[in-house]
Amino acid sequence: CFNPMTVELAEKAMKEYGEDPKIETNKFAAICTHLEVCFMYSDFHFIDERGESMIVESGDPNALLKHRFEIIEGRDRTMAWTVVNSICNTTGVDKPKFLPDLYDYKENRFIEIGVTRREVHIYYLEKANKIKSEKTHIHIFSFTGEEMATKADYTLDEESRARIKTRLFTIRQEMASRGLWDSFRQSERGEETIEERFEITGTMRRLADQSLPPNFSSLENFRAYVDGFKPNGCIEGKLSQMSKEVNARIEPFQKTTPRPLRLPDGPPCSQRSKFLLMDALKLSIEDPSHEGEGIPLYDAIKCMKTFFGWKEPNVAKPHEKGINPNYLLAWKQVLAELQDIENEEKIPKTKNMKKTSQLKWALGENMAPEKVDFEDCKDVSDLRQYDSDEPESRSLASWIQSEFNKACELTDSSWIELDEIGEDVAPIEHIASMRRNYFTAEVSHCRATEYIMKGVYINTALLNASCAAMDDFQLIPMISKCRTKEGRRKTNLYGFIIKGRSHLRNDTDVVNFVSMEFSLTDPRLEPHKWEKYCVLEIGDMLLRTAIGQVSRPMFLYVRTNGTSKIKMKWGMEMRRCLLQSLQQIESMIEAESSVKEKDMTKEFFENKSETWPIGESPKGVEEGSIGKVCRTLLAKSVFNSLYASPQLEGFSAESRKLLLIVQALRDNLEPGTFDLGGLYEAIEECLINDPWVLLNASWFNSFLTHALK
């Protein structure tokens, strides 16, 4: 019952998508119908030389007339987009996201035609929700003679629309007479959006129907309403229209509205990273070529032998809550067992420590409360969970800003090779590899990059040992590798970890470990930073300075700590921080390039005179070279990984909302808010005791001050 040209186009369209018209007959009929309606919509409509529209049905019209509608539907995709682009270029109309069906030269708008076997308003809302464009006009016809169009503007005269409705009625009758109509009517799917295809049945369906707001008869009816809900205009009105109980007063947000975040009081916060950062000291060997080079234990022993200033250890700063003699004994045991290894003919590849009382204590062996089967205790009358104490509030301490500043600095070694950031899966475009190389050059010597490689090494070694030697107290050297300025390889030892029992079944099961790390930092200078550590003095180191050699005490920072499979997995993937900060830099380059309409990568990295905003400090907006920007972004990403915590997650998510409001104010968008107090509460409940979160909050306050000046 369809026009032969329509049939041919519909077959072609389906084949383009790999569908068979003979199998998917309902879809085929729907495509044919839609094509016919589009052609009929444009038939006989012309525009005369004065731009007036007219209808000409008979033979030879005046040659000066121009077709009123451009037909886009029915062309192959490439051609269709070419037509759309040329219309947009000549008329200045916005380019639509989806291919429309027609363009109306009289009204200067694209038209989306819909033909539905369901109710027109439901189909209309689905279409509107899909194309989400104010500019494209929508016109829906149904087989029952109903129609619906944007703003009730039907574009065509009554008679032309009646022709279309009659044709649809005829198609329906012809299908019915062949027994095809029922199947065709029921086969219509909504516009393909994820929600539409998700069928809800059974109990869920009954629950959905029971929980509809008042005045809605069915879930579809409610969905159509929600999809058609345009979130512009006056919010108060929308809210009151939604429910009588809601009354949100929208308060204007002005420069004087926001107050600074309240940072907690209390003792200064303490270091909580899994390994030392700026305070770490390395024992290093250059151009390692010893036997077994690359085996951690061999490398560690070789590094230990480069130092000659060992002395009888003593406690320089006790751990307030711990048994300090045990920490001392643990270090002495490490020295003794390393000595034992050397006395053997063949050095083993791994070293398991003797399970001495000091190590059992430090690793919490037998400390876990005994597990009892629930069946045996469910009759206990006062069975309850432990009361856990609220975390104690801590105030911001200056050390965390110093840690961050140090992480942004350059070291005298390179910590990654050029190809460290992502392997090339495909031949990477020239620009992308150029950006990557420039970026790598800026960050390869950065201290944050050292932290990445150190973190990857420690987490990999610890996860390996946790799986391979579950019951053993394995000694794991903390090692990193780098290249000196002259390109010589270097192996560094930061200290040791001793791993506790590690039967890790779940991702969150904890493995305890004791870390022992070398340092030249005297813990008595900032004792609050080292609250969780017992610090031993273990030797004297000769340092070359401008005034000659000086001897400085060498310390060992010892603490018990713990981690889990999931944390180690993320620790092993710390190289992602390089990628994250590279992407942030790329978006800055993209922004520059789009303004200048050419790729600005080279200028961006090579123009040394230009400065860029790095961040806000109490002094104002800090600026620096592009290299400094790269390193600062990298350091932020690395600290987010090193100091990951629920407090950070909450603070980032909640403070971002306030940030967006302030930015909207800066851009003169006149933002309004309701329950700003609730937002402040949500942000401030994350400010408890975490050094990195507290530092970010104080940066946020600096930003508020300058943004609102």
From Swiss-Prot:
GO terms for cellular component: host cell cytoplasm; host cell nucleus. Its EC number is 3.1.-.-. Keywords: Cap snatching, Endonuclease, Eukaryotic host gene expression shutoff by virus, Eukaryotic host transcription shutoff by virus, Host cytoplasm, Host gene expression shutoff by virus, Host nucleus, Host-virus interaction, Hydrolase, Inhibition of host RNA polymerase II by virus, Manganese, Metal-binding, Nuclease, Phosphoprotein. GO terms for molecular function: endonuclease activity; metal ion binding; RNA binding. Mn(2+) 1 binds at H34, D101, E112, I113. Influenza RNA polymerase is composed of three subunits: PB1, PB2 and PA. Interacts (via C-terminus) with PB1 (via N-terminus). Plays an essential role in viral RNA transcription and replication by forming the heterotrimeric polymerase complex together with PB1 and PB2 subunits. The complex transcribes viral mRNAs by using a unique mechanism called cap-snatching. It consists in the hijacking and cleavage of host capped pre-mRNAs. These short capped RNAs are then used as primers for viral mRNAs. The PB2 subunit is responsible for the binding of the 5' cap of cellular pre-mRNAs which are subsequently cleaved after 10-13 nucleotides by the PA subunit that carries the endonuclease activity. This is Polymerase acidic protein. It comes from Influenza A virus (strain A/Chicken/Shantou/4231/2003 H5N1 genotype V). The gene is PA.
